[in-house]
Each structure stands twice: as structure tokens, then as C-alpha cells.
Amino acid sequence: MQETFKFLRCNSQGEAVEDKYSLKTLKNHFVVRDEYNNLFRVFSSRDDFWEWEADQPFEQKCFHEVVFGFFPQRLKFDIDFPVNKSYSEEDNDDNVYNILDIIINVIMDVFYETYSLPYNINLTREQILLTDSIGLNKKRELKYSFHIILYTYSVLNNNEAKAFTSKVLENLPKHVYPFVDPQVNKSIQNFRIIGSHKKGSMRVKMFNEELADVFETSMTTKKSDTLITTPFETTCLPCILTHVKEMTNSCDSIQQNELEEVLKFAGVLCKNHCFLRVHKNLVLFKRTSPSYCEICKRMHDKDNTLILRVAGNKVYQHCRHDNKHSLLMGSLSGTTNFVEIYVDQVMTKSIEVHESILFEELPDTQKHIYDESSMREYERVPTLVVKAQMKIGKTIQLRNYLQKYYGNDSISKQQTIRFVTFRQIFSKNIQTRLPNFTLYSEVTGDLDSYERVIIQVESLFRLTSTAEPVDLLILDEVESIFNQFNSGLHKYFAPSFAIFMWMLETANHVICLDANLGNRTYNILQRFRGDVPIFFHWNQYQKAQNDMYYFTSSREIWLNNLLKDLLEDKKIVIPTNSLMEARLLQTFIQKKFPEKKIGFYSSKSTAHERESHFNNVSYYWGLIDILIYTPTISAGVSYEDKRFDVLYGFFNNMSCDVETCCQMLGRVRELKSKTYKICLQGKQNYFPETIEDIETFTLQKRDTLFQTINNHQLSFTYSKETGRPIYYKTPYYHLWLETMRIQHLSKNHFITRFINQVADTGAKVFILTGEKLETVKQYTSIKMEIKHQDYVNIASAETIDANKALLIKQNLKEGITVDQQDLFAYEKYKLLEFYAWHGNKITPKFVEQYNSFMTKQNYTGRVQISRGKTVHESLTMLQTQELNFHQWAMQHAEHHDLQFNYSFQSHMYAIMLLTKCGFKCVQDPNILTNEQLMTKLVDEFVQYDLSAVSFEFKLKKPNKMDPQTILKFINKVLGIRYGLKIHHNKGNYYIKNTKAGSLIPFVRQQIKQSPCVVSNLLPITETFSTKEESSPTREETSSIKEKTFTET
């Protein structure tokens, strides 16, 4: 039943709704404005309206709900994108998709502040209803409009709605604010009804399932959920105009320097979110993947649930789904350093530092776990794995085992034993403890005739497989042994690895020992000795419980602590995994304290010096005041005397893994003060971390070598001639995957893994404090001096020919001492050879610019991509070359294949990204307008998965797919591969060199001034059309994610 009225309010021109109905009686009716017939209709119920509305002609469905301000109503927002207007700020273009996402996030954030924290009322995205009306307006112009409705809640009246809307508008970014209509909460408000359109327009307000899926909002299609006036089906929110519980306004806003520190907490504990924005004392995040919530104790896969709240100097973690509880994450330390923040977490036992390994999950019958200051007797089992900290007696108990089962009174005294080590010096160290073993380096010829042999992995080729397996295979520092097979130092890799695997698979007994035992050893033993059970012998005694570790990420604080101890005449040990840092420290200390004696050992030390000193460290290290060394010294070298006072370690994630760094700390066994002061630094990396991801990435690079390139779309199909490759997964392949996993974990999580492993030994950890003096400026200037001197030494070195260069290379590989001047001459030769620049004089500046990793990488990329007349031809040539190598390597030397850096796929991805942007090749001179490029980016990339490209270039996958974020990602790829970028200038985009790329220009003919890339690519003559396209239809705009707005 319905009644019609010409007017809503009383007047002299005709009957109005107000003439017949009071506010009280209207509460039980549903009032609709009929725009088409210019009438107001009053229905006895909403159901009556829906029944009547269903029978009306489409063109007459122009209905609006009349919302009276004094009635309870849902919170609503009208989002409108005007035609022919830029929705961006210069280089910060945001498409509709991102603007909507921003608005929804701000609504949720303001709701959290206004209702969640004070009243524990939660809002999820599933409680948000999103409708659209996209299409052509009366002028045949494309227009986008959306309604956002919080359909499960209501507020008391329009004034409460106004207050909430105002708070939302206050928090919107400036470039987003204009799209939200602030005038939708008037005392009488007409709000379009679902299924209706404006008179003369075909833009119908409707549910959009695809839109709901994109934004993870409600999938409801219940029409009554879209109505604003709410008689009974919602929860009424507390009034915010009359009484407000403030939990944020009374708090100071987070400052920029504090924000950096707060974000570190999220980096540690919340890896599935990215930073969104700050609101007063709240740090808000956007979800990027599902994660487990420690507050709710369950997985969350939707909503931006994570919020960090700063109260005083405390940082709390909150979840939008549970506002009664929070987690104390730590305190603001006054620094902005991640290391200090994480150490604070360890100190307060807020996180678990022990990383359990698969051995711990073995059944009780297969493990012996205890906590004692010395080792118990080893079990006589086929596969024994021993884990214990250093200096608890692992080697002593091994000697007892050998004496018991292989001594003079044993029936196995003549059985074959092979003791494998990973370093030559370690082998000699072991022989001093096991004098009845033969050291491989002290005998020549056949080693099989010796019953007991200590042998380093690189020399395993001197053994042969026999009909009878060895009785006992000992792998001391087993994790390091596995690492060594991936070192690239093997002269005879294939026979060495083959004999190793034969012994591992067939030995009657295997004993593996390591303080840093990990899952790699378990997986390898399970795969290749799975027919016999593993027995795990673990002494959990924490020998290091009296050691004190002080950590910092501040080089200044670390240096000033070091200087203070040197001034107090303390004797210092300085291990570092950076050769440059080691040289810098040596020079810095020599200048400050010329009277002090420094022992310095690195890969640049002569073979004679390393051999003589490492075999008698007690003598040589007893002569020095300061010991500096790189990973040249790890396991196998031990100084037992109590001479040194403090250890200062400097480590980063650009070199060896965490386990090797921790081994370096134990080369001086007894520190007088038991004090270790460590500076840790590491940039964020994005290497694949699981065996599955690493394998996928590895096989994919080889898979593409067998595919045919589609020239038009730069896509792949399998060649009929070569077919799809079949990969034979050999033992080395599985070991290589395990080793890559460990390396990638260290590169991605270096700092946390380092601190965890130290704390897991029982050592006490603290934050290293001190003043930040001006020392670092002098330190930095010395670094520049060292680098410049290297450039000078290389530039002024003798110019040698290929024969002498080959001799130096062979001597280095054989471990034969090479004169320092010859080393510089060899570096000079390699530089000239790389750029084909022989016969040209070079300067120190030339060395600085052209000997950099990035310049060389860009040069190689440019040469490879410009060999053919087109990029397609160049790609095909590179693909053929690498395919031939791959097929040869798989037939002759698989380890070469896994260690080879295949570049074809990286080129394929880089060129694919470039062409999707609208450019034809790396030398394309054409210019794209802002509109052309932004349209390309949206059409080509909004729904494109960049995971494979991220893996290839070790880049973080973009968290959002708006045009500018995509373009930044593309420019990183082009910069890495070619030294190029898509540059923006005055509304136009074109290809431009990066700083490194400008050093190696593309040319048609060789030039004399500097190295260059002689390109065979044909000139690009075709220009891009600027012809305007016709307006798209409704069907062409069905996917909101594929559309953007740009300047015209």
C-alpha cells in the first residue's frame, strides 16, 4: 500500500507528506522520492516498496530513500569521480582502485579509534557494503560512483553521522578528500536506492560481486542491507557527541624518528603487513597475506587487523577483532635501530630464540638428550649425530669411541676409517688429537691403502670407491662440510663429490658432529641413509652461560667503545666478515695507536703466512695486541691462552652466513672478560627461503631455455624440437638446494638469526651503549682513502698479457703466494679484458667508475640485448647460447649448471616489462604521454602477478598495484639489468640512462673516449599514436581494477 504526495514539507502549492504524517507515524513507514515522476511515495513498509518497485519499467526506476535526520541510520559515504579530472598529484597517480582502498582503510581506522578502543566494538571489511554505479552520464562521458555503507551498525541520528564523517574527512590524504561528498548527512537526505538510476542516466546503483572480492567487503545481496534508515536490524553505536572515551587524543602524536623505531617492531613480528599511515598515537598497517594472530590465537586472512599503539614509551600490538587484549611489544629505547629493539625483545624474553630442528622430533628411542658439563659416551649405531656447544668434549668422547671400537683390543681395529674435514688447517688440527691417523697432505699417491685417513673435502678425489664400504665415516663440523661443496674451490669437484656420496650412502657407521647442527644435515641423512635410523645425541649444556654479548647497529657507538678499550690498553680480537671493514679497522687503529702490534689475516694474506701462523697460533698470536681476521679463520683454528680481553665483532649480511659468523667468534676460546661487543648491519633482502620456492625458481630459469619466444607478446610456448625438459635430481642437486636455503635465510634474516643463535647458547645479551662521537667521520675518510689507493694501485699497475694473467689465476687457485703488485696487475687485466679496453690508458677515476658491480652488470646486460637486429633476435641468440651450455653441463658437470648464472630469463622479464609499458626496445626514442603510460600500466599490470619477476631480481613484490608503484618496480628491474629507467618530465615519459648506465652508452660505432656498447639493434622509427579512443561502454568498464584516471 502506498500514497503519493507532490511535496515533502507543508506549503500552499499542494498536498505534502507532512500534512498527513507526524514524525512518530513516519517512523513506521518508508518514504521514497520518485525522481522520474517528481513525487514522494509513502509505503506502509519496505516490503511493500520492493514488491511495487519490481513491476516498474526500467527507465522509471529513479528512486531515492528519504532519510530523516532524527531517525537512527547507517553510516554512509558517497564517492564520486568527476569526469575529465586528474586523480593524482604529479608523480603520485592513484587509480580508482587505490583511492577506494584508501577511503575504506581510513573509515576502518577512524572506527577503530572512535568505537573499538573505547567500547570494544569491532568493524571488519565484511561488515562494509560497497555498491557502484559506473557508466556513461548524460554527456556520454564515463563516470564512476560508489556508495560505502557500514550496514551492521547505526548511529542515533544524522548529527552523529556527521561527526563520524568529519573525522574520516580529517584523516583522508589531500588528493583523496575531494572524492568524498561531505554533504550526505543533512536533516533530510535523499539517498539512491539499489537498482535505481538518475533520471536520464543509465548508471544503475547495483551490487558488484567482483568489487566485493577485490576489497574483501560484504558479499550480501540483500536489498534491505543497503537502506540507510534502520528500524531494527543493526547495532546502535555509542554517541560520540555527548560522551567520548578518548584513548588517542590525550596522547602525543608519533614523531618521525619514533615511527622508524616503532616500524621495526612490525618488521620483526608482523611480516604479513605493510605500513599504511599514522593516526595520532596509532600506527596502522595493511594486510599483504594471511597471518597468525597472537592476540586472537587464530589465523586472519582478511582485514587490516594489525595496529600498533604507543603509550608513553611502550609499544603495544592490537588486533581489530579483540580490543580487550593487547601485547606489550617493548619499549622505545631512544634509538631508531632494529638491532637494539630486537635485543630488548630477547632480554625481556618476549620472543623464542631457539629454532627447533628436525632431529628434536625423532622418537625417544632415537635420541639421547641431557644437560651436563661434559659429554657422555657415544652410542654405537649406524648413523650417529652429535650436537653440543664448543669446549664440552665432543672430540674427547670421539677419541674414546675410536679407542673402544677401533683400538688395539677391538675386533674392528683394522677397519677403514675416513675423517672428512672442510679446511686444510682443521685437518692438521685434528691430526694433533688423533696421531694414529694419516693426514692426506703428508702422503702422495693412493690413499686407499691407508686404513685411517684425515682428508679435506677438496681432496676426496684421491680416494676411490671399492667393493667394501668404509666402516666408519666421521664428519666433524658437518654443516661446514656441506657448505664447502658449494664454495667453488674444487679443482676436481665431480670425483670428490661422488666419493663423498658413496661413503655417506654405504658406510657401515657415520658420525656427524656440529655445534650448529641444522635441518640440512637431517634432510641429507634421511634422503641418502634413510634405510637406517638416525640417532641424535644432544648435550644441551650451555657452556656460554657466563658470556656477555653487547649488540648494536651503530658503528659510531661500537667504534667509540673499541677506542675506549684500546686506550685502556686492553687486548682486542676483531672478527669481521667484510674484507673492506677489516682493512679499514687495521688502518684506523694503526693511525690511532702506532705502537700496538696488529695481527691481520684475510683472503689476501699469503699462503705461507696463513699456513705457518695457523699451525702455531699460540706463538704468533701471543706476540700481538690486536687480532683482526675475516672468514679465512673459522673452525679448525683455536687459541686457548688467556691473553685477549674483549672481542669486537663487525658483521653484515653481504658475505657468509650466520653460522659461519658465529664460528668466527670462537677462534679465541678464552676471553678474560668473557665480553663480546658486536655491531650488526644488514639490508633487507627478498630471496626465496623454502626448498619449494628455490627449486621452482631454479627450474624455471632452465625451463625457459627450452621454450619458443612469441615475438609479438613476448610469451613462451614449448618448442616442438626440444620439448619440455626433464630434470634429473641428483644428490648434489638436493644438497645445493639445502645450502641455498640456509644462505637465503641468512641474507633475509641475518640480524635476528645471529642474535637468536647467540642467545640460544645461554649467553646473556645486552644493548651496547655509548656516545656517538666524531670518530666515524675520520673512519669514513680513511675508508675513502683506502678505496682511492686501490684505484690508484690498479690504474698504475703493470699492464700484463693474457699468458701472465693465466699464470696468476692458476697460482691463486692452487694457493701459491702471489706478489701484491701482481695482484693489482691481474685486477687491471681483468678490468681491461671485461670492457675490451686493452691498449687504452686508464685512471683511478676510470677504475672507480667501471670496476663497480652495477656498471659491469649493466654493461653485460646491454651487450647481450643488443647483439641482434631486434630484441627478439638478441633474446633468441642468448637463449640458444645458454641452452647449449645447460645441455653440456647436465651431461658432464651438473655442479657447473647449478652455479652458473643464467641471464636469459632476467632479460625476458625486463623486456616484457618494457614492452608492456609501450616501448619497443631498450633504445626506443619515443615519448609516451602520462595518459598513455598510465593506461598501459593499469591495463597490463593491475592483474599481473609479478612474483616470478620479484624472485628473479630479488626484489620485494609490490604491495599494491597502482601505476606509480608498478612503475617504480619496473624501473628497479630496468636499472639492475640495463642501467635504464622510464623517466618522467613535464607529463611525458621516455627511456633514460641511470648514473651507471650513462657510463656505457649504446653506439653504432666504437668510440675512443670510454667503453661503450656497439649495438646492432635497428632504429625505431614508428611513433605512438595520440589519437583519442572512443568512450568505453559499460561492459568495457566491468572490471574496476583495470581502469585508471590520468590527466588529459
Swiss-Prot record:
Q: Name one GO molecular function term.
A: DNA replication origin binding
Q: What induces it?
A: Expressed in the early phase of the viral replicative cycle.
A GO term (biological process) for this protein?
DNA replication
Which region ranges are annotated with the description Disordered? Answer: 1025-1048
The entry's keywords = DNA replication, Early protein
Q: Say yes or no: keyword Isomerase present.
A: no
Report the InterPro entries cross-referenced here: P-loop_NTPase, Replication_origin-bd
The keyword Electron transport appears for this protein: no
Its biological function?
May be involved in DNA replication.
Question: Of which family is this protein a member?
Answer: Belongs to the asfivirus F1055L family.
Tell me what this protein is called.
Answer: Putative helicase/primase complex protein
Taxonomy, top ranks, is: Viruses, Varidnaviria, Bamfordvirae, Nucleocytoviricota, Pokkesviricetes
